Amino acid sequence: MPVRFERKGKLDYVINDNGAWCWFQDERALVDPETQALVVGSIAAAEGPDGERRAGNVELTVVDLASCTARVVVLHDAFEVDDHDVPALWRREDGRWLAAYTKHKTDDLLRWRISEPNDPTAWGPERTFDWSAYTEHRGVTYANLHELEGRLYCFSRAVNDDPCALVSDDDGESWAYAGKLFTRPKVGYVNGYTRYAAGEDRIDLITTDHHPRDYDNSIYHGYLAGGILHRSDASPVQARPFDAAGDAPSQVELTTVLNAGERLGEVALTHAWTSDIRRAPDGTIAATITARGDDRPADPEDEFSRLRPVLDHRFVYARQDPGRGWTRHSLGKAGAGLLPHEQDYTGLAVIDPYDVNSVYMSTPFDPRSGAETPHHEIYAGTTADGGASWTWVAVTQDSEVDNLRPIVAPGDPSRVALLWFRGEMTASQHFRCEIVLRDTARSSSMGAGA
């Protein structure tokens, strides 16, 4: 039964009292402009309200934006308590919703469900695709649903822990293995961490070499269009990507966006990680990246120590305007590693899908003054000069808990549906967080609502 939101300020509402998400799945949230429904996926934890019953649930919060009510729908009960398992969403032309999700490398199944027409609260049975013939039972992680040229892709981390894809030519009713997007000899935990952005005629992506705790990553960009994998300058990398019978290229053959060790101002950036990518209708591409700032330990052997504290991360805004190369500008400090055993986790910075000049970032440093705050706060930033300078407004302030991992849900260009979760997170499997929504008209101010 739908329940009315719990208001947390003048503008902010709690729409789910137990949930969190990772950031390597998309779209994690979508708006249907016709029905004014917003859907966002999350995982419930044992530490949260009703945790004994809900722990590990793959949940969708279905929000009626017109009536300010929300309903939590369970896609899979007691699935796995891990924020890496959140579903990717896609809305079909027939009004049905598709949700796809995996475990965090603990089995080899992609799971998906399809809703009733125009009703994301009513779902058909769960179906599965077994990757094990390709992964040799080493597990699969993440789902990303993007359409290109009439074909639906589901990008996952799978074979050799490389970015791979399944394809569907029937709107997600069935799936077939396409192949690897790119590959290279494995270092440490996994290979490239990839973020995707789909447009009308191409899918753009940014990726890393490996996990930042295992490798001093650079960041690379490419795009899929016309059946070809391209570099940023449109030169071809591979004429037949996903050729299951052949081998995929290495991501180093793409265009380098940020070099490991590159300096922005007086700070050397290392161990970079992908956060978000969006492409504007005019062809401008923007990406947000996190990196360690001046983090070369005195003993080089300590650089890849898993539990060594990393005290300084930076947010980077990278951009390619039409006909030009990539530029890189600092967004500000991202703070120390969010978790002791995950030194490269941050609150994240993301891009408005309808305005690449607008970003939202979660940080314990106020970008207006540089002052450190007791908790991670959300800030909205706008640029008028391609990222060289920014004007900031606080979305949250004086918080008693951290505000983390913002999302601007696409689907309705007339509104800014800003989501984040707030609370305490000690691991991807342990958190007590609630999901917050701020829904405003695009022309409205995004200032603090508390």
Give the location of each predicted region.
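Extracellular, repeat-based ectodomains that mediate carbohydrate processing or recognition
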Residues: 2-450
